[in-house]
Design a protein with these regions (language model features):
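Conserved N-terminal segment of class I S-adenosyl-L-methionine
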Residues: 1-104, 116-121, 174, 189-192, ...
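Short hydrophobic/aromatic beta-strand or adjacent loop that forms the aromatic wall/cage
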Residues: 151, 187-194
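Short catalytic micro-motifs in class I SAM-dependent methyltransferases
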Residues: 107-111
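Short proline/glycine-enriched turn/loop segments at secondary-structure junctions
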Residues: 162, 180-185
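Conserved beta-strand signature within the Rossmann-like core of class I S-adenosyl-L-methionine
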Residues: 131-139
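A short glycine-rich, Lys/Arg-flanked "PGG" loop and its adjoining helix->strand segment in the class I
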Residues: 118-130
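Acceptor-substrate binding/catalytic loop of class I
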Residues: 143-158
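Conserved S-adenosyl-L-methionine
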Residues: 168-179
Length: 209
């Protein structure tokens, strides 16, 4: 993944065009995905790689977004959401241990090498309270092939490994909205994995006790 690919105005404009298409509003394309995210009950969420804020809107703004694309951050703010670049977030009131109930990475990990995804989650893992959630959502085969900025295909096994290596042992995983076989044909079929930080966990995964 390069900054030229996802870091500029063109990528932000592409997200706006995709997410605000009139036919998608008419058909209610986001309704099942909104329902799915809400039923996970993430609480106050840190949305890492928030884009223009689709999932923050699904959560009724109950969270904070971070994105490396400043153009996306500006669009999210214009939609009434709280969003920052990583540098801005580091100086914000939200950058505090245990402040969040969950970290969400939705359609982010496939843009990174596995090790980079692990590093990204570790960077923010201390901000999640004990027993808080890590929610990972990634496209299946058809969705992965639909975007040239995708780098690594992330199936449930890889997502489970990422969650385990970042201090959020996997709790459940599933295919959504259709069974696993549909992912080879349906662009919007997703892998969903939920990990949970153990009670009393204070240190960051990978740090010595």
């Amino acid at each position: 993944m390069t900054q030229d690919t996802i870091g500029g105005a063109d990528y932000a404009n592409r997200l706006v065009a995709l997410q605000t298409a009139r036919w998608k509003r008419w058909l209610g394309v986001q309704v099942p995905f909104r329902w799915n995210l809400r039923r996970l009950a993430p609480g106050f969420t840190l949305d890492v790689g928030c884009g223009i804020g689709r999932n923050l809107l699904h959560l009724r703004g109950h969270g904070v977004g971070i994105d490396t694309n400043g153009h996306c951050v500006r669009v999210a703010r214009a939609r009434g959401l709280v969003a920052f670049t990583p540098e801005e977030f580091a100086e914000s009131m939200y950058n505090r241990p245990g402040y969040f109930d969950a970290i969400l990475l939705a359609h982010v990990a496939e843009h990174l090498a596995e090790g980079d995804t692990i590093g990204l989650i570790r960077r923010y893992s201390l901000l999640v309270r004990p027993q808080g959630q890590l929610i990972l959502i990634c496209p299946q085969e058809a969705g992965f092939a639909s975007d040239p900025s995708h780098v690594e295909f992330m199936d449930i096994e890889r997502l489970a490994r990422i969650a385990s290596h970042t201090g959020f042992p996997p709790e459940r995983s599933f295919s959504f909205p259709f069974p696993r076989w549909a992912g080879r044909l349906f662009t919007y079929n997703e892998f969903v994995l939920v990990g949970r930080k153990p009670a009393g966990s204070g240190r960051q995964a990978g740090q010595p006790e």
